[in-house]
Amino acid sequence: DLVAEHGEIVAVICHQRAREYPVSGGPSSCCRCVDRPDLREYAQRLVRETGYTGLAMFEFKEDGEGHPHLLEVNPRIWGTFPLTRVTGSGIPLLWAILAHNAGNGGAPIPLPEIPVPRQKKMIFAASDLMAGLGYARRGRPGQLFAALGDFLNPAVRDGLFEWGDILPGLAYYRSLITKEKRG
């Protein structure tokens, strides 16, 4: 997950999917920030060679020997984008400043010092609890206990629910409940 300007990465975090919902293949319900210099270097080469400016999410998958392979590059906001905020990476603010500066060459805002991202874990609580149940139904009860532990752990942040602005989180949870009833 990164923001770049003129072929140089301004800020980057690497995240790893821990659980997904639906468990048969869906978006992340739990992810964590990880330190992967090899993936950062790979992304930097592509960003530099293309002169890319903007947001991007590089998705890699490791083969059986642990070698990463690039699956896709999403030049847009992605589902786990809230992790950029949870980790304190500064990516949302930097992206906004770069967008402002692109259209205001005469009055650019200087980029602030880039913070070092914190190694954090994030869940989408409702879908992660349902993922835990789904994994348990598939014979992996440890994932249910992991989801419950993350739900109860105050250090693990929710990607949508914030006490200062509860409506987006409530709308998301409502949509999950109605989807579960239908299907």
Question: What do the PLM-derived regions correspond to, one by one?
Answer:
Residues 1, 15, 61, 123-124:
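Residues in well-ordered beta-strands of folded domains
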Residues 1-51, 74-96:
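ATP-dependent carboxylate/phosphate-activation module, predominantly the ATP-grasp catalytic core
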Residues 3-9, 63-66, 100-101:
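Short acidic-glycine loop/turn motifs at beta-strand connectors
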Residues 20, 64, 85, 101-103:
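Alpha-helix termini
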Residues 53-65:
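A short glycine-rich, hydrophobically flanked beta-strand micro-motif that places a catalytic Asp/Glu
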Residues 66-75:
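Short glycine/threonine-rich loop-to-helix capping motif typified by GTGT followed
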Residues 97-183:
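Peripheral (often C-terminal) accessory segments that flank ATP-dependent C-N-forming ligase machineries
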